[in-house]
Amino acid sequence: MSGETPVKPVEVDNDVEALESAKELSLKIDLPACLNAGDSLSIPSNYDETINDLKQALSLLPLSRSLTNYTIYINGTNVSDSVDDLTTFSQLFELFQWDSVDLLKVTIKERAYTLAAVYEQISRFREIIGLHYVDRMAEDLGVASGVSRLNELTLNAVKERENQEEKDRNEKSEKDEKDEKSEETEESFVLNEEDIKSLKISAEDLSSTIDIDLAATAASFNNIHTKIKLPIKSLTISQWSPVPAFQKNKGDLLYLTLQTLENETFNITCHFSGFFVNRSSTVNFNPEVKVNEKGQVSKNYLLVNLVDSLSPSFSKVLEENELSLSTSSEHPETYLLPNNSFLATPWYIDTVHAKNYPDVSRSQLPLILNGVDGSDYVKDWNEDFQSVRELPNTNIQERILREKLIQKALFDFTKTATDTSVNIIKGNLTPMNPNEEEGKHIYLKNGIFYASDATSVEVFEATGAEEAARYVASKDLAGVKVLNKADVPGVNNLVTCIVDYLGKRIVCQAPVPGIFNAAAEGEEEKVVYGLSTDGSTISQDKSFEEPLKQIAEVFHLKPHTVEVSDEIKSESELLVSKDTKGIKGTDSRKYVIDLYRTTPRDIQFTEAHFDASNDTSYPHGESLLRHEAVAEWWKRKVSALFKAETEKLEKEGKMESKDGEKPQIVLPTDQVVFNPDAFSFDSESDEDREVVRNLSKFVKEKLIEEFLTEFPSQVAPFDGQQLTSILHRQGINMRYLDEQTKATYEPTLANYDALYRVTVQEMIARAAKHLLRKLSADVPVNLFASFVAHFHNCLLGAAVNAQPAVEIEELYRSFYPESAFNFTKLNSDQVIALITKEVFLRFRYALPEDWSSVLIHPIPLMREIALKFGIQWKAQKYVFTAQEFAAYKEKFATTSKQVETAKSKKKGKKIQVVTEVVSERDSIFVADDIVNFVPIVKDSSYKASLIDEIFQSARSHIASGEKDVGLSIFNELVAIQEQIYGRVNSETARFYTLLAQVYSELGYQSQAAFVSRKAIILSERTTGFDSYDTITAYLNSGFYEAANFDLINSVSLYNQAVATWTSVYGKGHPTLINTLTNIAENYSRASQNESAIKLLESALEFSKLANGEVSEITGIVTFRLANCLINTSKFDQSLELYRACEATFEKVLGPDDALTKQASKYVSSIETYVKELAQQAVASGNSKIKVKSQTETVKNGKKNGKKSAIPQPDPEIASKSIDDILQFIEGNNPKKSSKKSKKSKK
């Protein structure tokens, strides 16, 4: 991507080494008496760790986690009040001039509580008892977010195996190598009868056609949080709070009411000295200490200890919870809550997961969490973010802290902005301009500015209006994201996110400080660089030039003059686009906004497809290239310049100086730039326009062509998300989907067929998303489920009911205007026609007339639309044919409650009667099938370059032979990754995926298998249980388990991967061929040849359908099946397949290819062997009996006295490799391993 920070392995290397070599320090901690700790606590640390690290350690340790209000004394000095929490121990030693030591004495002392400290203690209490899990579920915008399925597979524990060091094989013969491998396989795959039975069942499942039951799949979701039991019934702020004036002087801070599991109610006083039970009741106020009949009082400094003393069940339930969590999964990542990322919400869910838990105190959380006066809720998000960006980053510790705080700040902003956006769209908040039309409403809430994308529609009136404004908003966010990663000093950008919910888009930004202030006297315009807000002037504040030069370098922008008209033009060259504005905030910082013009126009596409006067025009004329495309173009251009300069110096003989040093070549990178305002005005130079035109051509003529050329050797995408990710990484915009579709319409490979299928489906899904947005413009929030269900009936249910009706209560109709119900008039033909038109408008692709019946795969398409629009469907069997629907009609019947008014027998009074009405469905979907809608959020977070730098450093050490150093750096990197992103994050999932791969490459298969399980769980929870990241993680893990010689685990993981992608893609993904052949190979290694043959036959059958009978892939699968048949002595069948292979390879690869020659050799050898067996059979008169007798002879260890020219069938040959088998057929018995020889001698 453009603007990425270059890797500096040497500097990072030194930093990591410094991190590893940081002087160790042991902390001996004396805990306060309230913890009943007894002996001191020892914690390992080092001089580079901070006071905050110590506090975090104390909050995580079971012994001290309930302590929240304390003072830290080190060497008798109160450091809590004298230094901040980010101070390192080394800085403390320097500040207080202490002598360097290995053991540091730390004393923790209680503090007097304040109301803020009481709130903090209550929050920690809720966390300890598990209420934070319930809080998270209650406040989550999605249902069953973060579910996982790995634990439901009940895998065996990872086998611990020693790493196999690389051995010098040069001194050994090739035969010995094979014998060693064979011996290793025999020793490693140990299977009992139950294992073999399980493997046979798995092979049957994998080789048969898989039908996915959505309800059964959703029921397998593992949501550990639902297993948490609460150790109390409730703890709430008492009705006697706040503390009256006459009690404040006595030290009372707050009053609580506790209800225990024993159904006892206690009123608790929060005092500056701790917590105690008082004498109050629900009707009488008496905050004095309660003395029981034994003359005892219940008082404790810690709330958790007090509650424990009052409820015998409290500790017992806490212990049960801890046991439940530890036994439910060996990986804490399964149940840990993220602190700086969203969890993925499944697109279909079992309604069992849609639970609510009673908690009176939940509604009081804003009071507890937002400070004593609520001021903590109001944040200056811009100041928070900019302050963190300005933190020092001179060494690795500073960079880690800074990146961690940046990621946290970005997430907290996005979380708050998302919650508020949902409330705005639901109509719960009042806009700043209520008299304007709804699309132009703006809001300023909690330091964040909210606006619809339609607020800037006037700016793009000529180029698509609302469509252009919507597109430009996402491009602005992309520019912000690049700039966040580039981290340009001296200039600031706004923290930004976009929220799409119920067809509406809200752009959220922390505003420039002072932007809403009234203009100062003499100040006419707040924009000091770029085109003014009203478009009347172009400003060029000189103080912006230096930082903007760096921004221009990040985006490869060319300095250029701008002439909008004779009156409106720049005085000198602008460094960025005229639309990028520079503003000075009241905080004295420089800000840049409107970063959508940081890539050039896609002029070739716009000229060809946009015409505002044409009904079939592309929706807008603001099409821009992606940053990845510009970065690739720049890299190739610079590379060409470098090559040309090198060749020039070589010709001139200047490549080496007299002292042998090569000259430094300064790359003229300022030559590889483009004008971001090209094709905006008539005054631009032809040269600038030509550069932008060539850039536009570069995408279509180079990037797309290269993608299609390289695609056959790549893994075909499973779904639209993966396809989008692949194309975006290559710099290809999604508007070019038609190019892939046209190129793969008549596929020659299964991969192309899969690409065509996914591409068409993606176009339809995206068209459906846009139609849902357009058609819902007037639909009220409360009718949205009815609208979406009806749209899906029209799109997917024509075979069941082409004219579906929408049931809406008459009462609802009185609430809204008639236009709100226009969607009920839609039918299947109209929706199909609208989709066809939308696909052509957006992708310039004409769908065939029968696309709705031929190209659609209902469940995968339903999933794609759900993920794009934020729909959560109820998990049940959805059928899409009239025959299936009739069979399931009774099951689909819905029960609803109806309220009727009737006359009472007594005095004729009117009463309301509730009756249950059972009604049969006449369409596939009803509103009740939609469980929830979730917002789709695009944020400005980025991958920290520090992680990549350290990763590359570790890889380079390993590549240069310093394996131990490399692994040591990787171990440090695990901790750094978790520090920056937390243990539950999609970036952490991807990191574990890479780490598992590294371990596997180095031969650490046990570690690879273990780490890959973490990658699966985190992928499921953060990217989705059926995302391509998750599918890939399952496939990788299956491979690592096989390499670790655990076939049962491996097959379970492969089976899950196949089941998942079948629900995502449907039947017949080409990856199935490779997966089945890999599993078959493992079965064969485990001597489960019959199952291996079944799997290979299934793979071959599918390959013939997908790739054709005469294709390289079909030939290779046939070859493997032939090999496997030899293992079972089925020589005739094997020979037939080898002949087919030879013919296929000769046609596809040519007679001189290695595969063709190998197949030919096998044909010749086996023909000879089969002929000799036949001759022997004729001589004996009964081939079956003769072969059997020969086998029995070998089994009994008796050999023919004469040396026979015909090799005897060997029952042990099944365990040999194909080469050994062929050597046997050719008359050369393969040598057995030394271990086997020793065993036979015994």
Curated annotation (Swiss-Prot):
CDD domains xref list: CLU-central
Alphabetized UniProt keyword annotations: Cytoplasm, Repeat, TPR repeat
Recorded superkingdom: Eukaryota
Gene3D superfamilies assigned: Tetratricopeptide repeat domain
The keyword Repeat is assigned to this record: yes
Family matches, as PROSITE patterns: CLU
Keyword Lyase: no
The family this protein is said to belong to: Belongs to the CLU family.
Coiled coil residues, start to end: none
TPR repeat start-end pairs: 31-64, 109-143, 528-561, 947-980, 1073-1106, 1115-1148, 1150-1179
Function noted in UniProt: mRNA-binding protein involved in proper cytoplasmic distribution of mitochondria.
One cellular component term from this protein's GO annotations in UniProt: cytoplasm
Subunit structure: May associate with the eukaryotic translation initiation factor 3 (eIF-3) complex.
Biased composition (Basic and acidic residues): 158-181
Molecular function GO terms recorded: mRNA binding
Localization of this protein: Cytoplasm
GO biological process, any: intracellular distribution of mitochondria
Clu domain span: 359-606
UniProt name for this protein: Clustered mitochondria protein homolog
Predominant place of localization: cytoplasm
InterPro entries from the UniProt entry: CLU-central, CLU_dom, CLU_N, CLU_prot, GSKIP_dom_sf, TPR-like_helical_dom_sf
Region (Disordered): 158-189, 1189-1214
